[in-house]
Structures are given as structure tokens and as C-alpha cells.
Amino acid sequence: MAAELMIEEAVAKGYPPAVLYLRNDDIVSTEVCAFNYFSVFLKEHPDAEAHVWLFDRTGKHVGYFRRDLGPNGQLQLDTSTLCSNVSGTVAMTLLPKQDTKVRSGRKVTTGYYAQYYSKHGAITLSHEREPVAAKSFPTSAWMQTYLSRFVESSGVVLINSCLAADGGSVGTARLMALNGDVLDERSLPSIAPMGAHRVPTLELFPDAKRLIGSSEGFSMEFKGTNIASPFSYYEFANGKFSLHHF
């Protein structure tokens, strides 16, 4: 059996894993889906390796998976078989089996999807966004609009995609009116490297309903350091839910 590839090694090779939210609990399970696109773009070297790393919400490395993918090979990995009751982050990369050099300063990120299955019958998915970062990075302001009538069911998932041991995230959250007025502002709790934090809107802003008033919508803004593109979510009492990148 091949030895586990360290995530830092993948970054050094020029193939930094891309990061997504991981949720495996008594309501939702996460499936990672990928296609061996190297067999399309590198026809002379069509074989690839899929590497998947799992982290809990505190950034602790809790699982690893590797699979060889031949021409047109596909991966559909139910991560709950590796970590049945862990939520945090998942990172995945594809590496060509043939050692294909990446030009200095360049990087190749992996396109893949995560599908989230609710035991109540809902399915939602997300494509990957940012790759992991070896060093701390500033976060531009991320903003998303929500429907006020679902404020009690809404929330945000924040992810720290930095690998550095001293790369904890810091930042602020703003509750915004649709006209751009700031209704409330809070400091965010620090998130450990490769960790994640899922928080309901009313936990983050307890007075949100009063502040939003009769407006049909509101926005939340997040900025700071080491915060990857957040996810907005709605999760209803009947188990239905949705998840979207900012």
C-alpha cells in the first residue's frame, strides 16, 4: 500500500488541494465527487491519483483516502465511511501518475464537487473554490444576501484554508441592510488552520430580527485573515437545507 501523501507535499508539487466544507452527522453526510480530467488533457499520461484529506472543526487531521484513477476514471467517496461523525473541512487533489512538472510559481488546482445528503431527502452540492494556502492571507470582504422570512433558519459556514501552524483566522462579521447600512458588527471567534465554524444568523446577531425590521432581505459580510469563501445556508425544521458559496 502506498504511503500517505502529506498535504504539504501536494502543495510543494504545485497541486494544492482545494477545500470544501465537510459535514457528517446524524442529519447530513458528505460525498466527494471527481473525474480524472488528466486523461482528457494529458492523453499520453492518462492515469492519476486522487488524494483526500479530512479535518475536524478544530483543524485536526482525522482521515485520509487515496485511489488510483485510470482513463476517464471517477471518484464518488462517501466520507462518512471514513469519519462518521465529523464536521470540518475536506481537501482534495488529483496528481498525474507521470511526474508532470508545474512551472515555478504556477499551480494546478483540482475541480471537484461535494454532495451533501440529508437523511430527510434533501440533496445539495457545491463545487470547490480556493486551494489551501501555505501562508496566512488577507481576506477581502465576502458578502451574501439572505431572505428575511428565513432568518431563523439561516446561517453561515466559515472555513480557514490556511495550513500554517500560526495561521488562525481573525475577522469581523457585519449585519447589513440592503441599502448598505451597517446594522450590527461582531468580532468572529478564531478558527484554527483547516478548521471550520458553522453558526446560525441569530446566534451571531441575536438582535437581527429587530434590526432587519420589515425589509424583505438582509446581507452578512465577513472579512479578516485566513477566511476562505464562506457558505450561506438555510436549514429548516423538516430537515430540508441548502448550501451556497458566497
Residue ranges, per PLM feature:
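Gly/Pro-rich, tryptophan- and cysteine-flecked surface segments typical
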Residues: M1-F246
